[in-house]
């Protein structure tokens, strides 16, 4: 018999070790796959049902056309439903409002909270501006109506009288939407009792928390927080992280859940990646020239929101653009609140393409002191004429949901990074594409560099996030210089002052005095237009069109590309609503089809239009059929 050959002990041990290592590798790979699958399941987008929302809220969202929750909603809603304090930071347009409204309403749906009769609202929602107050109130009222539940929400502003506030709160609403300045006024007037608020308040929401302190609401917030019970759930919503948010967090919250969320591929970007950011270097005197080139040569996409820092500059810009046939509307804190809301509604509805918004909070202290000094001098010269008081609660960059704004232009630069982020956040909302163009003068360059360095990521510090605007050549700008400078000289301080007064007189018609009339006759309100010319003299006809010899070839090609992109998006409507050849034909057809002329007693649908030499329609018909 043959002897079996035995392997050395060392060979056997090495084979065993190899097999064990292979088995361990297989086990590790399997564990890695399981972990990846679990992670994918956790990261997979959840539905509103999976978040534990009430079926009535889900039906309401379906009616509003909202099918899936955003990332901030997926993360925040479960924690809020559990009753935890939450600090949530997410970019503008990411759905923060619904992230707190949905769980807030669900908690108020419960039988316990509805059955108990309370002497004060159960939920306070505090926002920085009246415009945002109106927006949040409209959203929560819409959800309540669609859910068909017995809940009531009211909005209060500091301009309301004590009797108006008392009437608004007479129905014992569950939700109060207000600015921080209004709450202490309610306490002082006896409209709200601090003890009743302390007993009833269960949820406090601070929306746009990064702006509440920076715009002077600290004392108001301290008076509110002093009566907040410890059991009250507090929510802070913010677009940026700042020392003010940290200050509020320490002041109000107890062991909060901190959510800092960005969308896929967004990393820590403060401005959404779907917003392209550009800049143009020019002198302060040449800003009018450059904005004329941008708008008149059509190298930026409509609708356009233009930010300026002073009211006078806004009117100067409007008058300047009017001379070239460019209609625009103005939004500032000097206008009555109803007018401001109506301007926003018309702009969102697409009745005009250019809105000039005053962000006077972007002024530096020095600029504000200088403006105040000039105003005092003016008042001393003419005591009879006093300037209208500005609304301290006006804010156009603070969370306002502008619809389908494709381009934001910073005619004047904001004085802070936060201000820049909030301005740019007015475009690119709900994941749509957008762009921004900033006009930078030498005096603004230092602040601009601070903004650029803040936005630059740690990994890509050498890459400029804000790039030079490529579609406007120097030749294209210079070709318009003579016209622009000539027109700019005609827009004097006197013309600006007169147009400012005229605009205010025009907008008074939307004030509280006529509010009841417009509520009963809403069609009358639709007839009001906010982009009407303010200049007393009609613009020169030759300024409306640019001769071909002045247009730069490269810029003309860029303009064609922008128009093609606009057509692809279905945004081909001209500002002012319609117009053009088709509308003219419609007018002619209406004028030509007089029913008295076209009526035929024989029953023919075609009347006697076009009859000649006494021939009737039947003979004409016979001639045609032969």
Curated annotation (Swiss-Prot):
Residues 77-259 form the Helicase ATP-binding domain. Its EC number is 3.6.4.13. Keywords: ATP-binding, Coiled coil, Helicase, Hydrolase, Nucleotide-binding, RNA-binding. Residues 293-477 form the Helicase C-terminal domain. SUPFAM superfamilies: P-loop containing nucleoside triphosphate hydrolases. InterPro entries: DEAD/DEAH_box_helicase_dom, DEAD_box_RNA_helicase, Helicase_ATP-bd, Helicase_C-like, P-loop_NTPase, RNA_helicase_DEAD_Q_motif. Residues 1-48, 363-388, 568-626 are annotated as: Disordered. ATP binds at residues 90-97. One of its GO terms (molecular function) is mRNA binding. PROSITE patterns: HELICASE_ATP_BIND_1, HELICASE_CTER, Q_MOTIF. Residues 12-27 have a biased composition (Acidic residues). A motif (DEAD box) lies at residues 207-210. A motif (Q motif) lies at residues 46-74. It is an enzyme of class 3 (hydrolase). It catalyses: ATP + H2O = ADP + phosphate + H(+). Residues 9-47, 356-385 form a coiled coil. Residues 363-381 have a biased composition (Basic and acidic residues). The Q motif is unique to and characteristic of the DEAD box family of RNA helicases and controls ATP binding and hydrolysis. Belongs to the DEAD box helicase family. DDX56/DBP9 subfamily. This is DEAD-box ATP-dependent RNA helicase 16. The gene is RH16.
